[in-house]
């Protein structure tokens, strides 16, 4: 399941995390969203042996089952002073030019170092936006207390890399990945959806791990089922 190219990426990701820990004595924040990439970086942090603090910033509008999964993974939950609906009642709906909801609910500093599961393969915008495995940014005004170094250990990972790593490590994902896929279609829980988007063009494949009692497939057989264009 883990080919040579992916193993090199895994090794590089682990070395990156360890290199950050070598030059920083404190805990490293692990930005955990409850998504598949978060589960991957959580596993990598464990394998790297770094001192981390996995944190889920509750936006109050995440998919059903997310909080339960976060708790099951032993991740710390930070709750906002005001939820999403209280914010829009006061300020109206957010836009690309007015992102007050992100600032209030998830884009704020907790620790000096912040590991995020962002990947270039997720979108063209991210491919153009992120060039280095680490970057510095400010949450709020450009003051020292707002400065954070962000680390992207799986920046160069493809969707297939994530899929193969999840299956190889036997990672359990949030319910959303097992319950939905494609255009609001529902499938048996034996299926694992790597991209749970509601539009077919955003979910080019899904992984099926089905028993002999499900559609006649051999036990533990894994196959990639590509959507028709």
Label the predicted regions.
Residues 1-168, 222:
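ATP-dependent adenylation/nucleotidyltransferase module used to activate substrates
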Residues 168-229:
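ATP/NTP-dependent adenylation/nucleotidyl-transfer catalytic domains that generate, transfer
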């Amino acid at each position: 399941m883990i080919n040579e190219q992916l193993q090199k990426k895994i090794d590089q990701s682990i070395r990156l995390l360890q290199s950050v820990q070598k030059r920083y004595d404190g805990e490293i924040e692990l930005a955990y969203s409850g998504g598949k990439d978060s589960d991957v970086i959580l596993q990598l942090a464990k394998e790297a042996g770094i001192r981390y603090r996995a944190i889920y910033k509750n936006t109050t509008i995440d998919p059903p089952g997310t909080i339960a999964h976060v708790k099951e993974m032993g991740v710390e939950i930070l709750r906002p002073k005001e939820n999403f609906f209280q914010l829009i009642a006061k300020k109206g709906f957010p836009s690309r030019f007015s992102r007050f909801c992100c600032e209030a609910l998830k884009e704020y500093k907790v620790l000096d170092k912040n590991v995020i599961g962002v990947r270039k393969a997720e979108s063209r915008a991210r491919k153009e936006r992120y060039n280095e495995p680490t970057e510095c940014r400010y949450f709020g005004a450009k003051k020292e207390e707002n400065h954070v170094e962000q680390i992207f250990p799986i920046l160069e990972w493809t969707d297939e890399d994530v899929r193969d790593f999840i299956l190889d490590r036997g990672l359990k994902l949030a319910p959303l990945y097992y319950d939905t896929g494609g255009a609001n279609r529902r499938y048996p829980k034996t299926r694992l959806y790597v991209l749970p988007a509601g539009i077919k063009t955003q979910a080019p494949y899904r992984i099926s791990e089905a028993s002999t009692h499900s559609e006649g497939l051999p036990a533990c057989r894994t196959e990639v089922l590509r959507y028709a264009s």
